[in-house]
From Swiss-Prot:
Residues 1-47 are annotated as: Disordered. Residues 66-153 form the SANTA domain. Pfam families: SANTA. Required for normal embryo development. Residues 1-14, 24-41 have a biased composition (Polar residues). Keywords: Developmental protein. This is Protein EMBRYO DEFECTIVE 1674. InterPro entries: Centromere_KNL-2_homolog, SANTA. It comes from the Eukaryota.
Length: 281
């Protein structure tokens, strides 16, 4: 009995040891999903088709000339550069980044500082230019290519930067705010009066010169009596307080002259009458 049991155990162990494993199911549903092959161009260099990341930049060591179908402007400090897509036919499309533009052969043919000749086709890409800090005015000037006065771009941009200096209240220190708020009302009014007075003086100087010119012309053309009337009626200047005050003073002086002239005439007439009476005429 013991021997038969031992044989049966040995047979069961050998059967478990030598039993072949079941074959795997080779149905298509059990295959692992493979990544699709990249959609590479027929060329041998394996470049990416568009769209592709802008980090893929064409090496420019071996290039002598480049033709860009889509181009835009960039800046390196104060200098202008060009970026764009280079079309190589079967090789695909690559991104080209130039050095500083040093020479203009034609509006669409340029030369970089490293000696590469760049030909551009089509209109400028405005959206790319704006992303790189180029203004709309410059985009309009470089719309079809480089104008003949393209080198003046840097000077104009520098002048605009100097003129367009933004002044903000944040630039004023806090202690100045405190000084302004602590001023008394009379001092503020005095400062305002000084500012208005300086502006008034500037306006009066210009208007006085115009009045003098008109007075000289009127004196040469008319008589003395007509001059006084014409000066009063024709003087037209900036209507400020200073001008009105001077006009009133001038009219008053003219009135005094007329009064003195009429007074002298009355005195002479009365003297003549007295003489006639004394002689009995």
């Amino acid at each position: 009995m013991t021997t038969t049991r031992a044989k049966s155990k040995f047979q069961s162990l050998s059967a478990c040891r030598f039993t072949p494993l079941p074959e795997p199911n080779t149905s298509p549903s059990t295959y692992s999903k493979t990544l699709p092959k990249p959609n590479s161009s027929p060329g041998t260099d394996g470049t990416f088709p568009t769209p592709f990341p802008l980090a893929v930049i064409t090496p420019i060591k071996t290039l002598k000339s480049v033709t860009l179908s889509d181009w835009w402007l960039t800046k390196k400090g104060k200098d202008l550069c060009i970026k764009g897509f280079e079309s190589n036919g079967a090789s695909g499309v690559r991104l080209f980044s130039s050095g500083t533009i040093s020479k203009r052969h034609e509006s669409t043919t340029l030369e970089a500082i490293d000696g590469i000749t760049i030909s551009i086709n089509g209109f400028i890409n405005r959206s790319r230019c704006l992303e790189n800090g180029i203004s709309i005015e410059v985009c309009n000037r470089f719309r079809l290519g480089f104008p003949y006065d393209w080198e003046d771009y840097n000077e104009e941009e520098e002048e605009k930067k100097k003129k367009n200096v933004d002044i903000s209240f944040d630039d004023i220190p806090v202690n100045r705010y405190q000084d302004l708020y602590s001023l008394e009302g009379c001092l503020k009014d005095k400062i305002l009066d000084d500012v208005v007075g300086s502006l008034r003086d500037l306006v009066c100087q210009k208007s006085d010169k115009a009045c003098e010119k008109s007075r000289v012309g009127d004196v040469d053309d008319d008589d003395d009596d007509d001059d006084d009337k014409s000066l009063v009626s024709r003087v037209v200047g900036v209507k400020t307080r200073g001008m009105l005050r001077r006009r009133e003073e001038y009219e008053a002086s003219i009135g005094k002259r007329v009064a003195t002239m009429s007074g002298k005439r009355v005195v002479t007439v009365s003297k003549k009458k007295n003489r006639r009476r004394s002689f009995g005429w």
